[in-house]
């Protein structure tokens, strides 16, 4: 998954089999691709017209636009996606409307217990590593036993690029 691919130009440089993470917010009554607030960005619907890649990770930056995003995903036939970094009230709202393509965060601060409470209602877990990698053999098995798909945040996004090889070796020994 390529991080923060918020323009059609960047999208065209991504191999078709790869997925992308995008930042979506509302701006002047439009859905746009933009990480930062108060700035304009490319039109989300126009971006979808060009999308024929792998999994799309939807990082919603303006809460309560999720249902409009879902309408556009359906319109353009995008089926491989999930919501990332949503607030818990929004997660519950999405679940109550039947949406399961949601990732709950698992980190040293957000425990596996909440994930397991909602495991039949969500498809993904997003593993973040603010200060350390939280996954171990036991919780990995718990997640996999519940058929939850896993997405690992790359350590450099939390200023831990120096630990990438360490984490890679650790994870390879977990399976």
Residue ranges and their predicted role:
Residues 1-175:
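Phosphate-group recognition and catalysis centered on beta-loop-alpha active-site segments
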